[in-house]
C-alpha cells in the first residue's frame, strides 16, 4: 500500500509506549505512555484508580533529560484527569491531584 503520509506528517505522529508491570514513580523519561488493560499491574496510581478495573489510561510525561523537574499527567479511560510533579531526581513525586474541568 502506498504511504500517504508526507514527511512532515510522519514526524508529527505520536508514538505510545505500552506499559504494564511498572511503578509510575519510576517513569521519568519524557514521552507518551498507555496502559490499555483495565487490570494491568500498575502501581503508583491515584487512589481513585488503584483497583483492578480502573488501570487503563494514557500518561504524558514531561521532564528534563536528567529526570528532574518531571511532571506526569494521567488521562483515565474513565474520563478522570490527574497531575503530579517532582522538582528533583532525588525527590519523590507530589501526591496526585485530580483536575476538575468544570
Language-model region placement:
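Short intrinsically disordered terminal tails
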Residues: 1, 101-102
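Trp- and S/T/G-rich repeat-edge/linker motifs of beta-rich repeat architectures
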Residues: 91-101
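Glycine-rich, flexible loop motifs
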Residues: 2-79, 88
Amino acid at each position: 500500500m502506498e504511504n500517504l503520509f508526507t514527511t512532515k506528517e510522519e514526524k508529527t505522529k505520536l508514538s505510545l509506549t505500552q506499559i504494564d508491570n511498572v511503578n509510575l514513580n519510576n517513569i521519568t523519561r519524557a514521552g507518551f505512555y498507555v496502559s490499555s488493560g483495565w487490570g494491568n499491574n500498575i502501581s503508583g496510581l491515584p487512589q481513585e484508580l488503584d483497583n483492578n478495573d480502573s488501570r487503563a489510561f494514557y500518561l504524558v510525561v514531561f521532564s528534563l533529560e536528567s529526570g528532574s523537574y518531571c511532571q506526569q499527567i494521567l488521562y483515565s479511560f474513565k474520563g478522570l484527569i490527574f497531575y503530579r510533579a517532582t522538582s528533583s531526581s532525588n525527590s519523590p513525586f507530589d501526591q496526585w491531584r485530580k483536575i476538575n474541568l468544570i
